[in-house]
Amino acid sequence: MLPRGRPRAMGAAVLLLLLLLVVGFFLFGRDPDYGLGTTATLDEDPYRSRNLSASSPQLLLPPKCEMLHVAIVCAGYNSSREIITLTKSLLFYRKNPLHLHLITDAVARNILETLFRTWMVPAVVVSFYDAEELKPLVSWIPNKHYSGLYGLMKLVLPSILPPSLARVIVLDTDVTFSSDIVELWALFDHFSDKQVVGLVENQSDWYLGNLWKNHRPWPALGRGFNTGVILLWLDRLQQTGWEQMWKVTAKRELLTLMATSLADQDIFNAVIKEHPHLVHPLPCVWNVQLSDHTRAERCYLEAADLKVIHWNSPKKLRVKNKHAEFFRNLHLTFLGYDGKLLRRELFGCPNQFPPGAEQLQQALTQLDEEEPCFEFRQQQLTVHRVHITFLPHQPPPPQPHDVTLVAQLSMDRLQMLEALCRHWPGPMSLALYLTDEEAQQFLHFVETSPVLSMRKDVAYHVVYRDGPLYPVNQLRNVALAQALTPYVFLSDIDFLPAYSLYDYLRASIEQLELDSRRKTALVVPAFETLHYRFSFPNSKAELLTLLDAGSLHTFRYHEWPQGHSSTDYSRWREAQAPYSVQWSADYEPYVVVPRDCPRYDPRFVGFGWNKVAHIIELDAQEYEFLVLPEAFSIHLPHAPSLDISRFRSSPTYRNCLQALKEEFHQDLSRRYGSAALKYLTALQQARSRA
């Protein structure tokens, strides 16, 4: 007979054994091949609880000054926009220095080098790698995915990243962070000695093969893994013979599957199916996948659980999802977030400043905020973020006499773009001064316009708003620097050129036998109408009829006649051939010049003297001004800008402009010596007349 306490002990032992069997079933009973024992699947509640533990207090974070490394493959115009939103979300939450390793094509590199150089974010290092070097390594793999060859390049990252780099987080451009990336980096410490890659389980049934009839996916463990967020332990990867491993697997599977459907993700999963010990499953909140067939809602309970949102559907923000509106709003928050605010982060780490930022900050702190012209001085020192070729752009084939129209505008002038495209069939380079939010409105405006969406030879460059004064000459310089043709027509957005002007300018350049060695500025006579609706003249004869009838006027004839008087409109009426004119004080014609002409003086911001200074520079460099007899451009009426209103109403504003003029002439004297005396004399005479 057993002692009275013995049955209770045996009962407890049986219960404990049953509990262990249940736990073992959950950990190891899901899939004969899925013996990872580290996380549960989307179909099971334990998965949710374990994944939500990612932010638990037990997570040991690296030191605050440890550099975190992030690799991103980015190609083309659209991905270059996507990566900015991703970067904003990264920077918003991060507390560690970041080193971004960007594998780019030539288009993306040109865009992103300019953007990050002008963004000047502290404690961020950016390195670029040429994606062309990786193409031969993956071009043998047929790929049905819309990402093309670039979607396979994560397989070969170890061959292009520095050998000294041990660990890196690899991201797709279509992810948005809602947490500090250092928490993700800390998960490297959870890897076993044999694990080389960290991935989140795929959150759809794609790899189960039951989405539609005869669907045959690549092999995977259970649901497989998604490669939108990857933790790569690079040195271990090399030691395992990764290159040989994935190539052998890919070649074997391609014998029957013929092509990848999900690019690198298919090959990663096939390798992991064969070598499950290589993968460390990550908590699902680090890659909440919003694909067409996602079951991601099983991963999170509330917004605080989310770490990374992955828009991995071709539909992107238009994907149908139970919580799509919430995710969309989170993404749109960063889309419209003012990127300049991310410059002001405080890091107690050495070498946190980007090149030139420390000197710039010192110059700004030396300014006297009580000085009347403080705004002008501050604006001169402002470095604006610049996103060149904001939209897809197809430059025209090179032609020896081709001309690009160059102009700048702000949001309130967008309505001019369609009319300008109808009048000018040639290439254009336009700089837009916008906030981050306005840039998205502009994007929508172009995409929904039948006229603008068809014009791929128009390059739009966004200069992000920063400061109270309009940086007109910096905008012009941005647009001018991005022109790709031998000649440029330096215009303004409120002007519509004659319908025939583009062809006429090219023919004139050829007939006059101009080349870059001949310093010539072709003057396009400027006119204006005070009517919002009028019949645009198709020829010089029609224009003269409207001029005689009082429907048109020479530009600014009643406010600023000296600005265009040297063009000599009386002579132009009768002219049959180009004629030469001399510079005079305050002359500011619209001209066609070689692309390598002098840049505009960026000290002139707001309203006043910005074009005048440029024409003086052309004259000082001995450009000849030739007026074209059949050319014309017409200014349309519009509401006055804020800057011109301030110029008219504020004596301080006008005094500051006068101070800038004097500084400009002092610089001219230093550069051109006695040859610049005539410009100073003209300025003094104009001041005495005033």
Curated annotation (Swiss-Prot):
Function of the molecule: Bifunctional glycosyltransferase with both alpha-1,3-xylosyltransferase and beta-1,3-glucuronyltransferase activities involved in the maturation of alpha-dystroglycan (DAG1) by glycosylation leading to DAG1 binding to laminin G-like domain-containing extracellular proteins with high affinity and in a phosphorylated-O-mannosyl trisaccharide dependent manner. Elongates the glucuronyl-beta-1,4-xylose-beta disaccharide primer structure by adding repeating units [-3-Xylose-alpha-1,3-GlcA-beta-1-] to produce a heteropolysaccharide. Supports the maturation of DAG1 more effectively than LARGE1.
Listed GO MF terms: dystroglycan binding; glucuronosyltransferase activity; glycosyltransferase activity; metal ion binding; xylosyltransferase activity
Tissue specificity statement from the Swiss-Prot or TrEMBL entry: Highly expressed in the testis and kidney, but weakly expressed in the heart and brain. Expressed during embryogenesis from 7 dpc.
CDD domains: GT8_LARGE_C
This protein's UniProt keywords: Glycoprotein, Glycosyltransferase, Golgi apparatus, Manganese, Membrane, Metal-binding, Multifunctional enzyme, Signal-anchor, Transferase, Transmembrane, Transmembrane helix
Pathway given in the UniProt record: Protein modification; protein glycosylation
Lumenal compartment residues: 30-690
Assigned protein family: In the C-terminal section; belongs to the glycosyltransferase 49 family.
Glucuronyltransferase activity, as annotated region: 344-686
Gene for this chain: Large2
Assembly and oligomerization: Interacts with B4GAT1.
Catalytic activity: 3-O-[beta-D-GlcA-(1->3)-beta-D-Xyl-(1->4)-Rib-ol-P-Rib-ol-P-3-beta-D-GalNAc-(1->3)-beta-D-GlcNAc-(1->4)-(O-6-P-alpha-D-Man)]-Thr-[protein] + UDP-alpha-D-xylose = 3-O-[alpha-D-Xyl-(1->3)-beta-D-GlcA-(1->4)-beta-D-Xyl-(1->4)-Rib-ol-P-Rib-ol-P-3-beta-D-GalNAc-(1->3)-beta-D-GlcNAc-(1->4)-(O-6-P-alpha-D-Man)]-Thr-[protein] + UDP + H(+); 3-O-{(1->[3)-alpha-D-Xyl-(1->3)-beta-D-GlcA-(1->](n)-4)-beta-D-Xyl-(1->4)-Rib-ol-P-Rib-ol-P-3-beta-D-GalNAc-(1->3)-beta-D-GlcNAc-(1->4)-O-6-P-alpha-D-Man}-L-Thr-[protein] + UDP-alpha-D-glucuronate = 3-O-{beta-D-GlcA-(1->[3)-alpha-D-Xyl-(1->3)-beta-D-GlcA-(1->](n)-4)-beta-D-Xyl-(1->4)-Rib-ol-P-Rib-ol-P-3-beta-D-GalNAc-(1->3)-beta-D-GlcNAc-(1->4)-O-6-P-alpha-D-Man}-L-Thr-[protein] + UDP + H(+); 3-O-{beta-D-GlcA-(1->[3)-alpha-D-Xyl-(1->3)-beta-D-GlcA-(1->](n)-4)-beta-D-Xyl-(1->4)-Rib-ol-P-Rib-ol-P-3-beta-D-GalNAc-(1->3)-beta-D-GlcNAc-(1->4)-O-6-P-alpha-D-Man}-L-Thr-[protein] + UDP-alpha-D-xylose = 3-O-{(1->[3)-alpha-D-Xyl-(1->3)-beta-D-GlcA-(1->](n+1)-4)-beta-D-Xyl-(1->4)-Rib-ol-P-Rib-ol-P-3-beta-D-GalNAc-(1->3)-beta-D-GlcNAc-(1->4)-O-6-P-alpha-D-Man}-L-Thr-[protein] + UDP + H(+)
Pfam families, per database record: Glyco_transf_49, Glyco_transf_8
Chain positions recorded as Mn(2+) 2 binding sites: 492, 494
GO CC annotations on file: Golgi membrane; intracellular membrane-bounded organelle
Membrane topology of this protein: Single-pass type II membrane protein
Entry's transmembrane regions: 9-29
Endpoints of the signal sequence: none
Keyword Glycosyltransferase among record annotations: yes
Domain of life, source organism: Eukaryota
EC numbers for this chain: 2.4.-.-, 2.4.2.-, 2.4.1.-
InterPro entries registered for this protein in UniProt: Glyco_trans_8, Nucleotide-diphossugar_trans, Xyl/GlcA_transferase
Name of this chain's protein: Xylosyl- and glucuronyltransferase LARGE2
UniProt-annotated stretches for the region Xylosyltransferase activity: 68-343
